[in-house]
Amino acid sequence: AKIRRLVVASAHAWRDAIPPEMLAQQAQVNAAATEFMKETPMYQLYQRVAPRPEDFPRLLDKMGEAMAKDFDFSDEIRGLQMPTLIVAADADMAPPSHYVEMFKLLDGGLRDGGWMGEGRPKGGHALAILPGLTHYNLFLSPLFAAVSLNFLDDQES
């Protein structure tokens, strides 16, 4: 199946966009953090939807391994062919400027959009920085749902 439109939410494109204090916290994510993590909304959701909630410690080990690796998805972002909406919170894990830099990789924010939208990025890409939200509660926001659905339903690009 072809992906017609893409929403990328609260995801950073390169590891050095993450503040050092967050990298230090991420280094502590492993099975040993299970009891602490049981107090988080992430665990509550996992417990409700996972076929095997008892595997939560394994998930934490896998997450810790993944977060320890360096990454830079700049080339992959530049290569996106479908209209892509980058959504972030104004108090996300990476600063808003990071998501602007991601948008620039899609030809966004480089010029005035123009009266008729002629200066918008080719390909129908868009950026939304949502106010009053964080990396952890963005997906719970009605504003996130509305912005994402509006973009996904757009037939003009």
Question: Which ranges hold each PLM region?
Answer:
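Short beta-strand/loop motif that positions the catalytic acidic residue
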Residues: L80, I86-A88
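Short, conserved loop/helix-junction motifs that constitute active-site signature segments
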Residues: I77-Q81, L106-G108, G119-K122
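Active-site nucleophile elbow and catalytic-triad environment of alpha/beta-hydrolase enzymes
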Residues: L60-E76, M82
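Flexible "cap/lid" loop of the alpha/beta hydrolase fold
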Residues: K2-L45
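Conserved alpha/beta-hydrolase "acid-adjacent" motif
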Residues: M93-E101, L110-G113
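Residues at alpha-helix caps and immediate loop-helix transition turns in enzyme cores, especially N-
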Residues: I18-M22, H98-Y99, L140-F144
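Acidic beta-to-alpha connecting loop that harbors the catalytic carboxylate
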Residues: M63, D90-M93, G132-T134
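Catalytic active-site module of serine/aspartate enzymes centered on a nucleophile-bearing elbow/loop
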Residues: D112-S157
